[in-house]
Swiss-Prot record:
EC number(s) from the headed UniProt entry: 4.1.1.130
Stated role: Lyase that catalyzes the C1-decarboxylation of 4-hydroxy-3-methoxy-5-(all-trans-polyprenyl)benzoic acid into 2-methoxy-6-(all-trans-polyprenyl)phenol during ubiquinone biosynthesis.
Assembly mode: Component of a multi-subunit COQ enzyme complex.
GO biological process entries: ubiquinone biosynthetic process
Catalytic activity: a 4-hydroxy-3-methoxy-5-(all-trans-polyprenyl)benzoate + H(+) = a 2-methoxy-6-(all-trans-polyprenyl)phenol + CO2
Residues annotated as binding Zn(2+): H186, D187, H190, E202
Chief location: mitochondrion
Membrane topology according to the record: Peripheral membrane protein
Record pathway: Cofactor biosynthesis; ubiquinone biosynthesis
Protein's name in the database: Ubiquinone biosynthesis protein COQ4 homolog, mitochondrial
Amino acid sequence: MFVRKSCYSLINATRRCLRYRQLSSTTAGTVGTTAPTANISLNDEPQPAAAEMDEFTKEFLRNRIEVSDIQRLILSAGSSVAALVDPRRHDMIACLGETTGREALEKILHYMRSTEEGQRILVEKPRINTRTVDMEALKKMPEHTFGYTYVKFMEDNNITPDSRMEVRFLDEPGLAYVMTRYRETHDMVHAILDMPTNMLGEVTVKWVEALNTGLPMCYGGAVFGAFRLRTKQRQNYLRKYLPWALRTGNRIKPLMGVYWEKRWEQDVTELRKELNIELLAP
C-alpha cells in the first residue's frame, strides 16, 4: 500500500511539473516582444541567428521546455513509474526517453556525423508524416520494394506516421532531432523486421532498438514490457522472440544512420541483407 501511494504521489508530482513547465513555456513565448534568450546548445555555444536556422530548429526552440536538474530528475522518475503503471501513456514514455537518453543520443549523433548517409540526414533533417510521405505513391510501388513493405505494414496495423510526439525536454537541437528521427522511424524498423505492433512485437522490437541505439527507454520497454505478456506469448517470447531479438540487435548495422526515405524503391530483401537482418523464422 505504501509503495502504491508513493508511486502515485511521484506520478502526480510529474504531472504538476509538466503542467508548470508547459505554462511557463507558453508564457515565455507570448509575453514581451522578444524571444527567450536562454536557449543554449552543447558546450554553451550560442544558437545561430534565426535566419540561419533550419525549420526543425526554429520549431524546436519555440516549443521546447527548459527544465532544471531537479525537475529533470522528477520527470525521469515520475515518467518511468507512470509508464510502468500504464504503458499506454505515450506522453510519459516520450518524457522518459528525453530525460534519460542524452548520452545515448550523443553517441548516435556522433555516429551519424561519421557516415555520408548520416550526414545527409542531419543536414536535410527530413520529417516523416503524411504531409512529407506520399503514402498513395508507396502503395503503387512493386511489392518487393521497401516503400510498399512500409505502407502495407502501416495499413495492416492501422497506424499513422502522424502520431509521434514532439521533443520538448532536451536542450540541444541536434539531439532533439536525433530523438525525433528515432520516433519517426520506429515504424520503419517494425516494417524492416517484419514485426507487428502487438505487445509481443513491441517488446521484441524494443530489444533490437535497445541494443542498436543504447537508449535507456528502449531497455526499460524491453525488460518491463515482457512482464505484460500473456502466458502463451511469454512462452513464445522466451523460446523464439527474445533469442532472435538479442542476436539481431547485436549484429545489424546502426539503423539510425539509414536514410529510409531514399530507400523506398530498393528491394526489401536486398535492404535487409545490407543491414544484416535475418527475419524470425515462422
